[in-house]
Amino acid sequence: MALRVIRFSMLLLCVLAAALALAGSISASPSSEVDILHVDGDIVPAVSSYIDRGISHAEDHQAAAVIIELSTPGGLLSTTEKIVDRILDAKVPVVVYVDRWAGSAGTFITLAAHVAAMAPGSRIGAASPISTQGDLSETLQKKLTQDTAARIRSLADLRGRNEIAAEATVVEALSFTDQEALGLAPIPASDQQLLGLDSPYLSPPLVDLGAKDVDSLIAQLNGRTVNVAGEQVTINTEGYVKNDVGMSTIEKFLQAISNPDIAYVLLSLAVIALILEFIHPGAILPGVV
């Protein structure tokens, strides 16, 4: 009797172990979920935190891909570098979809993506670096421009995109429409001459895909193979489920107060509050504000 109990217990343990192993293999399988991030506005530290969190979330549940829907005039170079590095280190395919505008910093973020896509009527470029400390000396400005140009060339080379056009967005502050960036429309003759191109059509193109909306983009991603963390990964979006990953309340607040206009208003209010505190000491509220 005791022997039967022992055998039954061992059998039960084996069944449980097999079930756990099967569950682990199922959970480790890539899902058909596509995470969507929305970046609208300046590229500031709060946006970097948001993108990092979004990519980490996609990695945790092995999403088919994470799409960053982007519309930005630009932002801080240091923050842009962090976002670019996070995309390069990602363990899931990262797709940047230029919804309206990928200006300056947005150009780097777009070109860092495993897949770069643009919406009709959108634009990309004008990525020349500008110092927040005022005018730089000619030497320092040249160093900054050359370093930034090398960075964007390396990104274009890594993803097999047009290095000449990418560099021109930094050195010459050129911008391209979605059709020009896709190599489907001729660039202006003056730009063609400036770039030293034989053809007015960018070849290879600056971006990979054109899509009217996110659903159209996801359909085009299905079956596309990209290099993710040194491995060839085929994106499978068949039967996909979209998962919107929004900014947290804190991230929204930090992004809002990082806006130069809002920051100026807040600074002005702080100065007024300090003046009132000096005029009416002990009023408490102005000093606290």
Predicted segments with their positions:
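Bacterial N-terminal signal peptides
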Residues: 9-23
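Transmembrane alpha-helical segments that form the functional core of multipass membrane systems
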Residues: 247-289
